[in-house]
Design a protein with these regions (language model features):
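Secretory targeting and sorting signals
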Residues: 2-49
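Acidic, Ser/Thr
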Residues: 529-537, 617-625, 756, 848, ...
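Solvent-exposed loop segments of extracellular immunoglobulin-like
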Residues: 536-543, 628-633
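Extracytoplasmic
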Residues: 521-524, 557, 571, 589, ...
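Beta-propeller domain segments
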Residues: 115-117, 125, 139, 157, ...
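Lectin-like carbohydrate-binding module/patch detector with strong preference for beta-trefoil
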Residues: 831-955
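Asp-box/WD-like beta-propeller blade repeats and closely related beta-sheet repeat scaffolds
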Residues: 147, 154-171, 175-200
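Proline-enriched interdomain boundary motifs that mark the N-terminal boundary
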Residues: 506-515, 593-601
Length: 955
């Protein structure tokens, strides 16, 4: 969710114009982008190049913040210019054209990983039938937690994502009883990723729905997930979905919904009804995660953002490096995944690779891909794969600049001279595609040439953050959903905007409404604020507050007491001297106080490595609930990547241990981190609905690329072939610095930097708080003989602060360019202790016969204090007889043995709070085979389940 709209390791806000090498997908986002094009139903002149004058447009804020936005997912504009927008947790909101937001419905949903409420579409006949469509994951009887990676029976995890039609009541509330199930897409639940879920209509009233490949990308090295092993969870094989002509996943579906909610198949889909081994609903196939798309109603063309995988480099044994695409789809077809990407030629075809370690076969034939997966239920030979309209990776498409890769919506503007709207876009922009990018945070117009190719690309004014969805409204204005900067949840930057064309007229003022309290018991006194409200022309504003309980005020910052329980929308309207107005809403809950949630540990900014077992503690409190039921407290792990996040796993409890899986999807130099999201939903009180509160902490990798800084002064980024990930921080001169946040450095005692210098060298100091803050340690950077010649320099750290800080690396030396910094590593305290490792059975971890040969069996045995049962724990290494405890593989049942110490991840064991010992290479637990406690029981690794045969006491 690669390159998702879900939050990651902050590239945003660096203030630099130089590219970030890595990609931004979701999961989520979450998220991923989608779109497809339909059979041409009419003709339209190609768009002519047009320079956009930013001063001619105004970005009007309609809603902002978590209370009004939730976790923003998708939007749809109604005929009255009000906007429906969804949140993943099942909440549906409506924001009026004036900017007043209210919750109009809640749909029960299953919310593991990226699933939940996704897309929304408005029936073309809404004015008379008031129908809308939602795509969501119904709860069903799916087990909680994660599905197993291996096994023989995954039936409990079978689920569906549902396309359903609903009716809005006259007051715009959602009539849940009106639900009609239109179509269900079978899914494999309990594992991430790729839901898709966007909805649109063409001029003929056909409904289009995008679906993701429902496949796990995290164990494929950043290449294609085509793991055909019969004991693997089906989610590791995208051939069963995106490459399957008889499956609705990884597709764009096209149907005609009938009045009774049934549907028919319009002509021109990829497979005619009745074709064996196919589904007639399929319009476009071979898609990984078509998260956002838009249909150009004038031509029937679909413009779709398609997310790709994350491999940093191409591989002769695996396939091409990761890339993403904007696709222009004008007729039914296959777009390649999981066999081909980009140009969909041999050069960008994947290799038929045998998991887990080869061999590699030949490259797939993009002209006639063959799906021979045992999970394929469709045709063996697939339609030829079509090339992407625009493919890009890193800085490969100059007009898109550089940075993370996360293509999103791409609506087409169509000028209507008869439309009386005063804010419609000009005729000069007719036919232009308004492409949006989540991670790079831009909107650009693309001219479409007469032959359908992409023409001139121009910047379009945008002052929000990460674009989640966009569509033109009936007024000819562009409506944009801004995800904000959170990870798997909304935040203060989440917003809904309307971008208006108003080249010479009086522009609308912006209203900002806030309150010192938004929930509590009656009587509830609230102090309201209009701080931040403004007029673009600088005119004096007048203020009008409607508190939602029948009372009003004209004060700029009034105080009001609510005397009765209820849900109230306090609306501020500001008016400028020319009579234009803007509005903002604050939601007030009287009778049910929002809970508080605190993560007591780990601290925000704590260091981790993939494979770690991370113990956590959460404190939740609620005024009305009193004693907290810890089974209602949740902790989720979100894999952060650039400016998005992939929701990976959730478990319940006020305390526990989160197992951070080994990441097998992203480039090792990618900008990754962990987000821990603690959540509690109260029980509701005094007739008022439940309220959910989230709190998040970020964990930082011990080894990090220097170019992933948060802020900097004076430096630049350079491509260097010998650098990790191919990038360094360079042009470093005396007094320059880079900074990172957040960091909690408890237990850190050493710092190592990878550096190069063909300049004069210098010193690098580790500081906290500011560029002139306390120095924890300083290293001397020598002249290495070349900018591509790297060496490691290290220093011990002292006076390390407690708590969460901002980390600064400051640079000093003579004149001119000093050195480059590629990456850095923090070392943590590693107390050494020796003794037996005792299982829950009371027996000891034993080296068979005291043998020292590589491969000697490690087993359970009655404790006897022998040398072959004495283990030395140093950090995460376990040694006996001068050799290391080693996992022979990564699959369930891989033997645990004695082996020459080599520093590999297979010899790295992380102790969990529940007594588990987790192997860093596989993320699996040390296990007494068959749950036996007999002498001689072989020790193996197995998927962690918390059983007694996976509990160990270290010396």
């Amino acid at each position: 969710m690669r390159r998702y709209p879900f939050a990651a390791g902050r590239i945003a806000g660096t203030g630099r114009s130089i590219k970030d090498r890595f990609r931004a997908l979701t999961t989520a986002a979450l998220l991923v982008a989608a779109g497809v094009v339909t059979t041409v139903v009419g003709s339209s002149s190609p768009a002519a190049a047009h320079a956009v004058n930013a001063a001619d447009f105004q970005q009007v804020e309609l809603a902002r913040g978590v209370a009004e936005m939730g976790e923003p997912m998708t939007l749809a504009v109604l005929p009255d210019r009000s906007v429906l927008h969804t949140s993943r947790n099942g909440t549906l909101r409506r924001t009026t054209a004036e900017g007043v937001t209210s919750v109009i419905g809640n749909v029960p949903v299953y919310t593991h990983d990226e699933e939940g409420l996704q897309g929304i579409g408005v029936d073309p006949g809404f004015a008379t039938n008031r129908h809308i469509f939602l795509f969501y994951a119904p709860p069903l009887n799916t087990p909680g937690g994660d599905a197993p990676a291996t096994g023989t029976d995954f039936s409990a995890w079978k689920g569906v994502n549902r396309l359903a039609r609903f009716t809005l009541n006259a007051d715009y509330t959602l009539n849940l009883a009106s639900q009609v199930t239109v179509l269900e897409v079978g899914t494999d639940r309990g594992m991430c990723c790729h839901v898709g879920g966007d909805i649109d209509f063409d001029a003929a009233g056909n409904l289009y729905l995008s679906t993701g490949d429902d496949s796990n990308p995290f164990d494929s090295g950043g290449y294609t997930p085509i793991d055909e092993r019969t004991n693997r969870n089906p989610t590791y094989d995208a051939q069963r979905s995106a490459g399957n002509t008889n499956d609705l996943r990884g597709k764009v579906l096209r149907i005609k919904v009938n009045a009774d909610g049934s549907y028919s198949i319009p002509p021109g889909n990829l497979f005619a009804p009745g074709t064996a081994g196919t589904r007639p609903e399929i319009y476009a196939m071979g898609l990984r995660n078509p998260f956002r798309f838009n249909v150009d109603k004038a031509t029937g063309a679909i413009y779709l953002g398609e997310y790709g995988p994350d491999a940093g480099t191409s591989s002769s044994t695996r396939g091409p490096a990761g890339m993403v695409e904007f696709n222009r789809i004008t007729s039914a077809g296959n777009f390649g995944w999981p066999y081909c990407v980009g140009s969909n030629t041999t050069a960008e075809a994947y290799v038929d690779y045998t998991f887990p370690s080869g061999p590699s076969g030949s490259r797939f034939n993009c002209a006639a891909p063959v799906n021979n997966s045992p999970r394929n239920t469709g045709l063996g030979t697939l339609p030829a794969a079509r090339a992407a309209w625009i493919k890009y990776d890193n800085c490969s498409f100059a007009a898109f600049g550089c940075g993370s890769e996360s293509p999103m919506s791409a609506p087409v503007y169509r000028y209507d001279a008869a439309n009386p709207s005063s804010v419609k876009f000009p005729a000069a922009l007719d036919g232009h595609v308004f492409a949006t990018e989540f991670g790079r945070r831009w909107i650009k117009t693309i001219d479409v040439n007469a032959d359908g190719s992409a023409g001139q690309v121009s910047d379009f004014p945008w002052r929000g953050t990460q674009v989640m969805d966009a569509a033109f409204g009936p007024d000819g204005a562009l409506y944009v959903l801004d995800y904000g900067t959170g990870w798997g949840s909304g935040d203060a930057s989440s917003a809904l905007y309307r971008i208006e064309y108003n080249p010479a007229g009086n522009k609308a003022p912006t209203a900002r409404a806030a309150a010192d309290r938004t929930s509590g018991s009656a009587p509830l006194t609230v102090n309201f604020s209009s701080a931040g409200s403004s007029d673009p022309e600088g005119g004096a504003l007048s203020y009008s507050w409607n508190f939602g309980d029948g009372t009003t005020s004209t004060a700029a910052n009034p105080s009001h007491t609510y005397t009765a329980n209820g849900q109230f929308s306090a609306t501020l309207t500001v008016t400028d001297p020319g009579g234009r107005s803007g509005a903002a809403t604050v939601s007030i809950s009287v009778g049910n106080t929002a809970p508080t949630v605190r993560i007591d540990g780990p601290a925000n900014g704590t260091l981790f490595s993939f494979g770690d077992a991370v113990p956590y503690t959460i404190t939740a409190s609620d005024r009305e609930d009193g004693t907290i039921d810890c089974q209602r407290v949740k902790m989720s792990y979100v894999l952060g990547h650039d400016s998005h996040g992939h929701p990976i796993t959730t478990q319940t409890g006020c305390s526990g241990t989160l197992q951070i899986p080994v990441d097998g999807e992203h480039d090792t130099a990618a900008n990754l981190f962990a987000v821990l999201d603690a959540e509690y939903t109260d029980l509701g009180a005094n007739g008022q609905p439940p309220v959910t509160t989230h709190t998040q902490h970020v964990l930082q990798l011990r080894h990090r690329q220097a170019e992933h800084y948060s802020t900097q002064s004076g430096t630049a980024l350079y491509d260097k072939a010998a650098a990790e990930g191919g990038r360094t921080v360079g042009d470093i001169q005396n007094g320059d610095w880079i900074a990172f946040q957040p960091y909690a450095l408890g237990g850190v005692n050493r710092f190592t930097a990878r550096v190069s210098s063909a300049g004069s060298g210098g010193t690098l100091s580790v500081r906290t708080g500011s560029p002139t803050g306390p120095v924890l340690g300083t290293v001397t950077v020598p002249v290495t003989g070349g900018w591509e010649t790297f060496t490691d320099v290290s220093t011990a750290l002292s006076n390390v602060p407690t708590g969460t800080v901002t980390l600064y690396l400051t640079f000093a030396g003579g004149t001119g360019t000093l050195f480059d910094v590629d990456a850095y590593t923090f070392g943590t305290s590693a107390a050494t202790r020796t003794g037996p490792i005792v299982g829950a059975s009371g027996k000891c971890v034993d080296v068979n016969g005291g043998g020292t040969a590589d491969g000697t069996k490690v087993q359970l045995w009655t404790c006897n204090s022998g040398a072959n049962q004495r283990w030395t724990v140093t950090g995460s290494t376990l040694r006996a007889l001068d050799k290391c405890l080693d996992a022979a593989g990564t699959g369930d049942g891989a033997l645990v043995r004695l082996w020459t110490c080599n520093g590999g991840a297979g010899q790295n064991w992380i102790a969990g709070a529940n007594g588990s010992l987790v192997n860093a290479q596989s993320g699996k637990c040390l296990d007494a085979n068959g749950a036996s406690s007999a002498d001689g029981t072989q020790l193996i690794i197995w998927s962690c389940h918390g059983g007694t045969n996976q509990r160990w006491t270290l010396p």
